[in-house]
Amino acid sequence: MGCPVSRGGSPGCGRRIAEELRFFVVDREASMCGDSCNGGGDRQQRQELAAAARASLLCLGGVMQQHITAAKARAELRKELDAIDAEWRPVIARESLRKELKAIDAQWQHAITFLRISRAIVVSIELSKELKAIDAGWEPVIIHEAQKKKREREERVAQVRRELRAELRAIDAEWRLVIARESLRKELDAIDAECRHTIKLRSALRAIEGRMELSKELKAIDAEWRPAIRLESAYRAIIGSIELSKELKAIDAETQHAVELRRALRTIEGRIELSRELKAIDAEWAPRIAQAELAAAADALKRAADKLQALGKMDTTSTPGTDLIGVVTTAIATLAAAGMQPAPSTALTGVAAEVATPSTALGV
C-alpha cells in the first residue's frame, strides 16, 4: 500500500499523514476492542492494518526528513540573501537615489534653465548699469584725454608737414639746376628728333668729304712710300718667321720629353682601358663562348663517333657514361695501327685534340 500523500513534500502533506495515522490508530484500537469483544477477529485484517500503519509511518518519516532538509536549505538561502542584501544595500540605495535625482532633474529641467537664464539676464542688467555708471563718472576724463590726443596728433601732423616742406625746399634748391638741365636736354632731344634727317644728311656729307680727302692723302702717301713699306713688311715678316722658328725649336726642345711622356702615358692609359674593356667583354661573353666551344666539341665528337661507327671500329659496348674522347682516340689509333688508313684523319685528330685540350681563349 502506497503513501497517500503527494510527492511535493509540503508541510500540508505531513499534517494530512499525521491525521490519517491518528485516525488509523483510533480505528485500530476500536477494531481491537471489537475483536476482543467478539471473541477474536480476523488476523489477516489486523496484519494488513499493521502494514498500512508501517507504510504510513515510513512515508511520514520521509516527509519529515524532506521538511527538515528544506528548512535547512531555506535557512541557508535566507542567510545568503541577508549577506547579499547587506553587501549590495548601499549600491541599491545609491542607484535608487540616482534614479530619483534624475527624475527630479528631468522634471525641474525647464525651471532650472529658466532660473539660469533669469540670473544671467539680471547679472547682465546689473553689469550694464555698473558700466553706464562708470562711463558717466569717467566721461569728462575720457573726453579730455580724447581731445588731448587729438590736439597732440594734429600738432604732430603739422610738425611733420613743416619738416617735409623744409626738406622739399632744400631738395628743390639742391636739384633745381639738375632739373633745369634735364628739361633743357629734353628740349634739345625734341629738336634733335625734329632735325634728325637733316643732321644725318649733314653728317653723312661730312663723312663722305672726309673719306674722299683721306683717300686722296692715303693714295699720295702710298704712291710715295709704297717701295719702302713693301721692303719693311718683307723684312718684318722675315724677322718674325726667324724668331718664331727659334721659339718653336726652343719650345720643342723643352717640351719634347714631356710630349714623349704624355704620349707614353696616353698609350698606357689606352692599353689599361682596352684591357679593362677586354676583361669586361671576356667576363660577359666567357660563358657563352665556353658553351659554344663545348657544343662544337660535342658535335665534332658525335661526327667522329658516327664516322668510326660507319667504319665499324667503334666500340659498341660504350655506354653514356663512357669517356667518348678516349673511345674516339683509341679507335683512331687502332685504325692507324691496322693500316686501314695512311694516317689518322686530320679532322678527327684535330677534333680530339680540341676536346682533349681545354680552350685558352678568353681564359676559359
Curated annotation (Swiss-Prot):
Disulfide-bonded cysteines: none
Keywords attached to this entry: Coiled coil, Secreted, Signal
Compartments (UniProt record): Secreted
Gene Ontology BP, a term: biological process involved in interaction with host
One Gene Ontology term, aspect cellular component: symbiont-containing vacuole
Coiled coil: 142-196, 288-313
Record has Signal as a keyword: yes
Molecular functions (GO terms): actin filament binding
Primary site of residence: secreted
Keyword Cell membrane applies: no
General function of this protein: Associates with actin filament appendages that are formed in the inclusion appendages of the parasitophorous vacuole during infection of the host erythrocyte.
Protein name: Appendage-associated protein
Species this chain originates from: Anaplasma marginale (strain Illinois)
